Protein backbone atom coordinates (compact mmCIF):
# COMPACT_ATOMS: atom_id res chain seq x y z
CA UNK A 1 0.00 0.00 0.00
CA UNK A 2 1.05 3.57 -0.72
CA UNK A 3 0.90 5.69 2.46
CA UNK A 4 -2.04 7.80 1.20
CA UNK A 5 -4.09 4.80 0.01
CA UNK A 6 -7.14 3.76 2.00
CA UNK A 7 -6.44 0.27 3.29
CA UNK A 8 -9.41 -2.03 2.65
CA UNK A 9 -9.25 -4.23 5.71
CA UNK A 10 -9.92 -4.17 9.45
CA UNK A 11 -9.20 -6.30 12.48
CA UNK A 12 -9.96 -6.78 16.16
CA UNK A 13 -8.33 -8.61 19.07
CA UNK A 14 -10.24 -10.67 21.64
CA UNK A 15 -8.51 -11.32 24.97
CA UNK A 16 -9.87 -13.75 27.55
CA UNK A 17 -10.69 -12.20 30.93
CA UNK A 18 -8.43 -9.17 30.39
CA UNK A 19 -7.47 -6.66 33.08
CA UNK A 20 -6.41 -3.27 31.74
CA UNK A 21 -3.82 -1.12 33.50
CA UNK A 22 -2.19 2.16 32.50
CA UNK A 23 0.94 0.45 31.19
CA UNK A 24 -0.05 -3.17 30.55
CA UNK A 25 -2.80 -5.73 29.92
CA UNK A 26 -3.08 -8.87 32.03
CA UNK A 27 -4.98 -11.78 30.49
CA UNK A 28 -6.66 -14.82 32.02
CA UNK A 29 -5.33 -17.18 29.35
CA UNK A 30 -2.13 -17.37 27.35
CA UNK A 31 -3.99 -17.21 24.06
CA UNK A 32 -6.10 -14.68 22.18
CA UNK A 33 -8.04 -14.39 18.93
CA UNK A 34 -7.64 -11.93 16.07
CA UNK A 35 -10.49 -11.34 13.63
CA UNK A 36 -9.37 -9.99 10.25
CA UNK A 37 -11.83 -8.71 7.63
CA UNK A 38 -11.26 -7.69 4.03
CA UNK A 39 -14.25 -6.83 1.79
CA UNK A 40 -12.24 -7.69 -1.33
CA UNK A 41 -11.45 -11.38 -1.80
CA UNK A 42 -8.03 -10.76 -3.33
CA UNK A 43 -6.89 -8.68 -0.35
CA UNK A 44 -8.17 -11.30 2.08
CA UNK A 45 -6.41 -14.09 0.19
CA UNK A 46 -3.07 -12.25 0.22
CA UNK A 47 -3.23 -11.69 3.98
CA UNK A 48 -4.44 -15.23 4.71
CA UNK A 49 -1.58 -16.78 2.75
CA UNK A 50 0.85 -14.48 4.58
CA UNK A 51 -0.54 -15.61 7.92
CA UNK A 52 -0.04 -19.27 6.96
CA UNK A 53 3.61 -18.64 6.08
CA UNK A 54 4.29 -17.47 9.64
CA UNK A 55 2.32 -20.21 11.38
CA UNK A 56 4.09 -21.73 14.42
CA UNK A 57 6.85 -19.09 14.39
CA UNK A 58 7.67 -16.93 17.41
CA UNK A 59 7.20 -13.15 17.26
CA UNK A 60 8.83 -11.18 20.06
CA UNK A 61 6.54 -8.35 21.19
CA UNK A 62 8.46 -7.17 24.25
CA UNK A 63 11.52 -8.02 26.32
CA UNK A 64 9.74 -10.87 28.10
CA UNK A 65 6.87 -11.79 25.76
CA UNK A 66 6.37 -13.40 22.39
CA UNK A 67 3.35 -14.63 20.42
CA UNK A 68 2.85 -17.62 18.11
CA UNK A 69 0.21 -18.03 15.41
CA UNK A 70 -1.18 -21.52 16.07
CA UNK A 71 -4.19 -21.57 13.73
CA UNK A 72 -5.78 -19.58 10.91
CA UNK A 73 -9.07 -20.25 9.17
CA UNK A 74 -11.47 -18.55 6.79
CA UNK A 75 -14.98 -17.92 8.15
CA UNK A 76 -17.76 -16.84 5.81
CA UNK A 77 -19.60 -13.72 7.00
CA UNK A 78 -23.28 -14.23 7.78
CA UNK A 79 -25.65 -12.28 5.55
CA UNK A 80 -27.97 -9.77 7.17
CA UNK A 81 -31.63 -10.55 6.58
CA UNK A 82 -34.03 -7.61 6.66
CA UNK A 83 -33.54 -3.89 7.20
CA UNK A 84 -32.60 -3.86 10.87
CA UNK A 85 -29.50 -5.26 12.59
CA UNK A 86 -27.95 -5.36 16.03
CA UNK A 87 -24.15 -5.10 15.92
CA UNK A 88 -21.42 -5.40 18.53
CA UNK A 89 -18.28 -3.30 18.09
CA UNK A 90 -15.42 -5.80 18.42
CA UNK A 91 -12.99 -2.90 18.17
CA UNK A 92 -13.70 0.75 19.09
CA UNK A 93 -15.50 3.13 16.74
CA UNK A 94 -13.39 6.14 15.76
CA UNK A 95 -14.99 9.16 14.09
CA UNK A 96 -12.34 11.72 13.30
CA UNK A 97 -12.98 15.28 12.15
CA UNK A 98 -9.84 17.00 10.87
CA UNK A 99 -9.47 20.79 10.90
CA UNK A 100 -7.14 21.75 8.05
CA UNK A 101 -6.80 25.35 9.22
CA UNK A 102 -5.06 24.54 12.48
CA UNK A 103 -4.19 20.90 11.69
CA UNK A 104 -6.04 19.50 14.71
CA UNK A 105 -8.28 16.47 15.11
CA UNK A 106 -11.54 16.12 16.97
CA UNK A 107 -12.79 12.64 17.81
CA UNK A 108 -16.58 12.38 18.10
CA UNK A 109 -18.25 9.87 20.44
CA UNK A 110 -21.77 8.85 21.39
CA UNK A 111 -21.69 11.49 24.14
CA UNK A 112 -21.48 14.32 21.59
CA UNK A 113 -24.67 16.01 20.37
CA UNK A 114 -23.56 15.84 16.74
CA UNK A 115 -22.67 12.12 16.86
CA UNK A 116 -25.40 11.02 14.44
CA UNK A 117 -24.57 13.71 11.89
CA UNK A 118 -20.82 13.08 12.04
CA UNK A 119 -21.27 9.31 11.88
CA UNK A 120 -23.43 9.66 8.77
CA UNK A 121 -20.90 12.03 7.18
CA UNK A 122 -18.20 9.44 7.80
CA UNK A 123 -20.33 6.66 6.32
CA UNK A 124 -20.93 8.71 3.16
CA UNK A 125 -17.18 9.02 2.65
CA UNK A 126 -16.73 5.25 2.80
CA UNK A 127 -19.99 4.26 1.08
CA UNK A 128 -20.79 7.11 -1.36
CA UNK A 129 -23.20 5.04 -3.47
CA UNK A 130 -25.47 4.67 -0.39
CA UNK A 131 -25.73 8.41 0.34
CA UNK A 132 -29.55 8.53 0.25
CA UNK A 133 -29.87 5.39 2.36
CA UNK A 134 -27.48 6.84 4.93
CA UNK A 135 -29.59 10.01 5.17
CA UNK A 136 -32.64 7.89 6.02
CA UNK A 137 -30.99 5.41 8.39
CA UNK A 138 -31.95 5.30 12.07
CA UNK A 139 -29.76 4.26 15.00
CA UNK A 140 -30.19 3.21 18.62
CA UNK A 141 -27.01 3.87 20.63
CA UNK A 142 -28.47 3.35 24.12
CA UNK A 143 -26.12 0.38 24.67
CA UNK A 144 -22.99 2.30 23.64
CA UNK A 145 -20.57 4.33 25.74
CA UNK A 146 -17.56 6.60 25.40
CA UNK A 147 -14.07 5.30 26.10
CA UNK A 148 -10.50 6.59 25.76
CA UNK A 149 -7.73 4.54 24.14
CA UNK A 150 -4.00 5.04 23.67
CA UNK A 151 -3.07 5.17 19.97
CA UNK A 152 0.55 5.77 18.95
CA UNK A 153 1.25 7.76 22.10
CA UNK A 154 -1.95 9.83 21.92
CA UNK A 155 -5.18 9.37 23.86
CA UNK A 156 -8.22 9.47 21.58
CA UNK A 157 -11.96 9.37 22.29
CA UNK A 158 -13.82 6.35 20.93
CA UNK A 159 -17.19 4.61 21.27
CA UNK A 160 -17.86 1.01 22.30
CA UNK A 161 -20.83 -1.28 22.79
CA UNK A 162 -23.85 -2.44 20.85
CA UNK A 163 -25.63 -0.45 18.14
CA UNK A 164 -28.94 -1.11 16.38
CA UNK A 165 -29.23 0.25 12.85
CA UNK A 166 -32.34 0.45 10.67
CA UNK A 167 -31.30 0.99 7.04
CA UNK A 168 -31.21 -0.43 3.53
CA UNK A 169 -30.24 -4.13 3.60
CA UNK A 170 -27.41 -3.70 1.09
CA UNK A 171 -25.92 -0.88 3.17
CA UNK A 172 -26.07 -2.96 6.36
CA UNK A 173 -24.24 -5.85 4.69
CA UNK A 174 -21.63 -3.49 3.27
CA UNK A 175 -21.02 -2.00 6.71
CA UNK A 176 -20.65 -5.48 8.19
CA UNK A 177 -17.98 -6.70 5.77
CA UNK A 178 -16.14 -3.38 5.39
CA UNK A 179 -16.28 -2.04 8.98
CA UNK A 180 -17.14 1.57 9.84
CA UNK A 181 -15.57 4.79 11.05
CA UNK A 182 -11.95 5.91 10.71
CA UNK A 183 -8.66 4.02 11.13
CA UNK A 184 -10.08 0.58 10.24
CA UNK A 185 -6.68 -0.76 9.18
CA UNK A 186 -5.30 0.21 12.60
CA UNK A 187 -7.79 -2.02 14.39
CA UNK A 188 -10.92 0.12 14.77
CA UNK A 189 -14.57 -0.10 13.75
CA UNK A 190 -14.99 -3.85 13.21
CA UNK A 191 -18.59 -5.00 13.55
CA UNK A 192 -19.97 -8.38 14.60
CA UNK A 193 -23.57 -9.25 13.70
CA UNK A 194 -25.66 -10.31 16.69
CA UNK A 195 -29.05 -10.56 14.98
CA UNK A 196 -31.06 -9.09 12.11
CA UNK A 197 -34.73 -8.77 11.24
CA UNK A 198 -37.23 -6.95 9.04
CA UNK A 199 -38.81 -3.85 10.55
CA UNK A 200 -42.03 -2.66 8.93
Language-model features: where?
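RNA-interacting cores
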Residues: 1-200
Amino acid sequence: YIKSDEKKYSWAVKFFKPKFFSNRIEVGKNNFEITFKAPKTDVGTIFFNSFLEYKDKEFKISENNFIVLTDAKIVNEKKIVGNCARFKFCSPLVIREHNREDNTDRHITVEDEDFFDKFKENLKIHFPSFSNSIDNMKMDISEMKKAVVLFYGLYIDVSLGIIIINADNSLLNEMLISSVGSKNASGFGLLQLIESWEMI
